[in-house]
Each structure stands twice: as C-alpha cells, then as structure tokens.
Amino acid sequence: MAPSADPGMSRMLPFLLLLWFLPITEGSQRAEPMFTAVTNSVLPPDYDSNPTQLNYGVAVTDVDHDGDFEIVVAGYNGPNLVLKYDRAQKRLVNIAVDERSSPYYALRDRQGNAIGVTACDIDGDGREEIYFLNTNNAFSGVATYTDKLFKFRNNRWEDILSDEVNVARGVASLFAGRSVACVDRKGSGRYSIYIANYAYGNVGPDALIEMDPEASDLSRGILALRDVAAEAGVSKYTGGRGVSVGPILSSSASDIFCDNENGPNFLFHNRGDGTFVDAAASAGVDDPHQHGRGVALADFNRDGKVDIVYGNWNGPHRLYLQMSTHGKVRFRDIASPKFSMPSPVRTVITADFDNDQELEIFFNNIAYRSSSANRLFRVIRREHGDPLIEELNPGDALEPEGRGTGGVVTDFDGDGMLDLILSHGESMAQPLSVFRGNQGFNNNWLRVVPRTRFGAFARGAKVVLYTKKSGAHLRIIDGGSGYLCEMEPVAHFGLGKDEASSVEVTWPDGKMVSRNVASGEMNSVLEILYPRDEDTLQDPAPLECGQGFSQQENGHCMDTNECIQFPFVCPRDKPVCVNTYGSYRCRTNKKCSRGYEPNEDGTACVGTLGQSPGPRPTTPTAAAATAAAAAAAGAATAAPVLVDGDLNLGSVVKESCEPSC
C-alpha cells in the first residue's frame, strides 16, 4: 500500500512553485548591500568642506594639475566646492577656501546659483577649463546672472566670460539652463561646451560655446569665445535637461544626445565636419511625450555599439539597445517593468561598481512630496539574447529621504573600486554623501586614461578593452552625463577573474592606438597618449586580441568572422551561420511567409515592410508589473504633474518653486 501524501506538503507545493518561478520572471533584488556610507569618515558635514546647502551638478577633473582628480560641486545657495582627497588624513578637503589669496577662490562664485558643471580643454593648453551653468532667479528664459567659464591664468582661476573681449561679443549666457557637456566636434583636441538651456517660447535656445582662434591671442592670455550653435545645427528651443556626448552613431566622431522636457529628445549625429543633424526620430529615441532627466552611454550587451539609458521624470525609464536593421540604426527599449517603473529621477549613472564585468545602473531620485529611495540595477550580458536586468540592494545609498540632485563616480583613493558621491538640495538643504562598494574586492580591474594631442583628458574618446575570455568591453570617456554632471575622464573596466589582453583607443578625429596589456599591468592605471605621425609609420606590433577577435592588416583587433572559416562551424540541423560581435550563432533555415523574414536567431518571422510582431508573452508577475508601471505613468500624465517642482501646465501660471528646480 502506497504511503499517503503529507497534507502540509500539499499545501506548501503551490507556494514553492511560486518561489521557483519568481526569479525567472524578473531579476529579484539581492540581499547583499552594494554600498556603505563613508561620509562621516571621508567627508564629515562641516562649514568648509561639506556644508549643509543646496547642491546640484558634480564633475571630476584635475583642478590643481597634480595628476589626481578633484570633485567639483555646483553650489546653488552656497559656494561651489572643490574636493581633494588628502591621503594623509584619508579625507576629502575643500581647496576652494574663502580666502582671496587662494588660487581657487574665484571658483567659489558665491553669487551664482550654479546648477550644471563640466570641465574640458577649450584652448588646447593641456589643462581643462571649468564651466558653471548659473540659473539665478529663473526656471526658464532669461536669468539675472551669467554663467562662468574659469581658466587657470595668472596663477589663479579666472572667469574668461567676463573678459572685455567676450563681454563685447555677448557670449556669456543669461539664459536659464540645466546640463552642460563637452564635445570635440571637429576632432581638433579643443572642446566646445554644449549648453542645454531651458527655453521660454523663442527665448533661450541651446548654445555651443568654443574658442574663436582668429580673435584669440593665447600668448597674451586673450581667449575670445563664440557661440557656434546655429552654425553647427544644434540651436534648438526646448526644455533642455540631460546631455551626453560620444560616438553614438559615428565610429569615432562625437555625437550629442539630449533628453528634453515638453518636447522630443535630440540625437545630434556628427556629419564628420563638426556639424550635426538630428536623428532622434529616425533612430527611435525621440520619446516626445516624456520628460527626460539623467542620461548615460554604455555598451550593455557588448556588441560594440553604444547604447543609451536615461530616466524620465515620473515616467517610464528607458534602456535603449542600438540595433541595425537593413543598414538603418534603430534603438530598442529593453527596460524591464521594474526598471522602467516611474520615479522622480534626477541622476542616472552607469558603472561597474563591483568589478565583475557587468555594468550597474544607479538611479538617484529626489524625495519629492514623499519618500523616494534610490535604485540600483545590474545589466547582465547574455549570449545571443537581450541582457538580464537584475535589481540590486543599494545598501546605504538607498537614501529614501534624500533630495538627490546630482552625483558622480570616481576612484578618489586609488584602490581600484569606484566611489559614489551624491549631491542633494532643491527642496531641502542637505550635505553631500559618499559611498564605497562592499563587493568585488578580489576582482581584477583596469583603468585607462587617454590624452588629447595637447595632453588634456580625451573626453569623447572610445576605449575598447579586449580580454582573454570575455570578449571586448567598450567605454566612452565622459564629457558630460548623469544630469547636470560629468563623470571622471577614465575608462574603468571591471574584469572579474578575467584578464586584459590588449586595449584600443579611438579619438574623435578617428586616430587609433592599440597596444598589448601585460599581465603585470592588471589592477593599475594606463595612460594612453595621442599618436604621433611617426607612430603610424611603424609596422604594427603583434596584438593579443582574445577570443572571437583577431588582428587585421591595419594593426588593430577586429571581430573574427567564424562563418567563413573552414571547416564550417555550424551543425547540419542548424546550417545558417550568423556572425556576431566576438562570436557567432547557428540557426535553422526557417521559412517565412511573404513580407516576413527570419529574425537574427531564426526563432521567429519578422516583418520586412514595417509590420510589427505581436506583443511578447509575459508571465503573470511581469504582466502585473507592466500594468502597474502603465498605471503609474498614466496617473502622472492624467493630472497636473510637478516637473522638478514646477507645474507642467504649459502656459498656465506655475506654482512658485526654487528657480532651478
């Protein structure tokens, strides 16, 4: 006689089955916290270095030109800060002190309501200038105080926008704006500064400020500036918000992506001559009904193409993978329901915080009307499929009551682990907060710092690291991202237990350098100099390109096309070979009806004449989350909504708020 079934076990079976399927439907939040707060030991709140004030954008550059990075903070109702890591004290210390004799005194700019900040070399002297976007007494349109562009001159930092030559030219912006970013639009090594203004009707178009070489005399310290936005094709009227720069559509030239408010996004494709054409609509990233905030660029699925991630204010967040269909570039949103869940987002940061090879995405939210915790996701690459998006535990960086306004990543203490610095403000004065990672201490890493022909940081350059086992990893040297911010000018690679084989840098002018990475160079910082003409005449040295790649005649690593190799790599039951970046896949010879063709992996038929496949089947859990996200987004658009503290009602009179909200 068979034993009777345990009734308790029978009741538990449905619950166990539910637990079994939950991780499959959506990446579950891991219990291990990613970050630990170290503010009290590294940057304790005080009057001089971490005042309780309204802060906004944050940038990373070498302010004192000693080879180490400083963290520059835009202070809105207080001074701007320049934080330097003191290795003896193991603390961040503000070097922009309130002493007129200090070479950094002018950077404080106590009168300015600074909101955005960026740094780059605009005159080719090898040292980065620092631009602060001020938005005094204005949410949009005309402000009452100009922006500042600081240059190290006469042994101190001075504002060159207030120079007589530039005052006469009327270059200094009096328009309210948000983000600023640096773009080497012609590949000259001299940068222009893109200013995302917040237009009011036909007042306050976006600007593009750069040095006028014909009117400048650098030997006498005269640096004449001009606005070339109209000439370059980027003079647009919009509610400018986030900006990010890099070779998005171009192979090397710097393109510009802007996520906007109350209007479509811009994707300015560099024509190769420093002029741009907006390709956002044709590429599928215009998102005209949402209100963009933080944005970042990365290659999330490691296919060698630059992808875009950004957050929408109380709207669905986007994770766009770049695709190529019949030779046309399109972006496809792969955001999961949890990832896309609307929130009052400000900063979006992409980095490998635990050095495990996979990129994380950090959403810095502002506690708006109620608590709003920050969120963290890992994007896990999958062979021949979309990445898996897994929600993580931010640990101390959760900050449910934080009024998040900005943030950056940098390794200020040189331990190979990225540190996270967050700024707060707008509706409540709060000090900065600093976090260190808790995971991945034993993982390998490599940091690459390319230089321009003048020796400055090569912002906008593309860095590809070829590895022994995990293929190619791509990074863009940041020229502005996050929202109001600019990350460190470093390509930081976490490698897990893998090792680098070679590295390749492509500058905005198309020049390239490839070199092997010795095993002894792991877990270090590599500086890559701009190539000299004589370097290109030498025979290329043999490169170790790693699995899936091989050295070509031009001396650089390229994807190996396994599909043309002999013997044939695919089995008989899957005879169609599809070459992919660093790999290949085999699929069946699927037959499709007229007007359709097999998709890339041969698992389905897709339309060739504009037909769209039906919606993907979703599990009950994913469907519920999708419905919840749609409901939240609908609620956000069905009634008057506050957009950064301002009613989004068009011409209707707006509620009072901080002008820079």
Curated annotation (Swiss-Prot):
Up-regulation conditions: Up-regulated by BMP4 (at protein level). Up-regulated in mesenchymal stem cells undergoing chondrogenic differentiation and by BMP4.
Tissue: Expressed in the interterritorial matrix of articular deep zone cartilage (at protein level). Isoform 1 and isoform 2 are expressed in brain. Isoform 1 is detected in lung and chondrocytes. Detected in cartilage, bone, cultured chondrocytes and lung, and at low levels in heart. Not detected in osteoblasts.
A cellular component annotation (GO) from this entry: growth cone
Gene3D superfamilies named in the record: Integrin alpha, N-terminal, Laminin
Subcellular location: Secreted, Extracellular space, Extracellular matrix
GO molecular function list: calcium ion binding
UniProt modification remark: O-glycosylated.
PROSITE patterns: EGF_CA
Alphabetic keyword roster: Disulfide bond, EGF-like domain, Extracellular matrix, Glycoprotein, Repeat, Secreted, Signal
Origin superkingdom: Eukaryota
InterPro entries per UniProt: Crtac1, EGF-like_Ca-bd_dom, EGF_Ca-bd_CS, FG-GAP, Integrin_alpha_N, NOTCH1_EGF-like, UnbV_ASPIC
Residues bearing carbohydrate: T608, T618, T619, T621, T626
Disulfide pattern: C563-C577, C570-C586, C592-C605
Limits of the EGF-like domain: 559-605
One GO term (biological process): regulation of synapse assembly
Signal peptide range in chain numbering: 1-27
Swiss-Prot/TrEMBL FG-GAP repeat ranges: 46-88, 105-147, 283-333, 395-437
Protein name in UniProt: Cartilage acidic protein 1
Gene name of this polypeptide: CRTAC1
